Amino acid sequence: VPIQKVQDDTKTLIKTIVTRINDISHTQSVSSKQKVTGLDFIPGLHPILTLSKMDQTLAVYQQILTSMPSRNMIQISNDLENLRDLLHVLAFSKSCHLPWASGLETLDSLGGVLEASGYSTEVVALSRLQGSLQDMLWQLDLSPGC
């Protein structure tokens, strides 16, 4: 498979995930920069400059989304899994050894946070994920390093 096709597929999948997030209407109601107490484990917006950092960030979001009860989260989590696979192919094409990121070890307490504020967690996670994906889309045009 030509690497340009993999890169194009990666960008298309990112756009698809962003569209899915947009289709979940309540995600529009929060700023991705908004600080919500107790949700510090959700990655914020900061430049994601390398393929390994992209994979780590997606692993955390995937872990958070699979902990949520919403059916929408299952589809987005599956999309993130596919996106991570594509990032690994891109990394391999650049001779990068990209270890499979595992997310956060500290999410044991996530169950309690979700019980207390599941809706807020979902809104903030999706909003920040959307921002991170748009950042990744931009970074992919700059040919990120390992």
Curated annotation (Swiss-Prot):
Chief location of this protein within or outside the cell: secreted
Record's keyword terms, sorted: Disulfide bond, Obesity, Secreted
A GO term from the CC aspect: extracellular space
GO BP terms in the entry: activation of protein kinase C activity; adult feeding behavior; bone growth; cellular response to leptin stimulus; energy reserve metabolic process; intestinal absorption; leptin-mediated signaling pathway; lipid metabolic process
Keyword ATP-binding listed: no
Entry keyword RNA-binding: no
InterPro entries reported for this sequence: 4_helix_cytokine-like_core (IPR009079), Leptin (IPR000065)
Recorded superkingdom: Eukaryota
Gene Ontology MF annotations: hormone activity; peptide hormone receptor binding
Places the protein is found: Secreted
One Pfam family it belongs to: Leptin
Disulfide bond entries: C96-C146
Membership in a protein family: Belongs to the leptin family.
Described function: Key player in the regulation of energy balance and body weight control. Once released into the circulation, has central and peripheral effects by binding LEPR, found in many tissues, which results in the activation of several major signaling pathways. In the hypothalamus, acts as an appetite-regulating factor that induces a decrease in food intake and an increase in energy consumption by inducing anorexinogenic factors and suppressing orexigenic neuropeptides, also regulates bone mass and secretion of hypothalamo-pituitary-adrenal hormones.
Descriptive protein name: Leptin
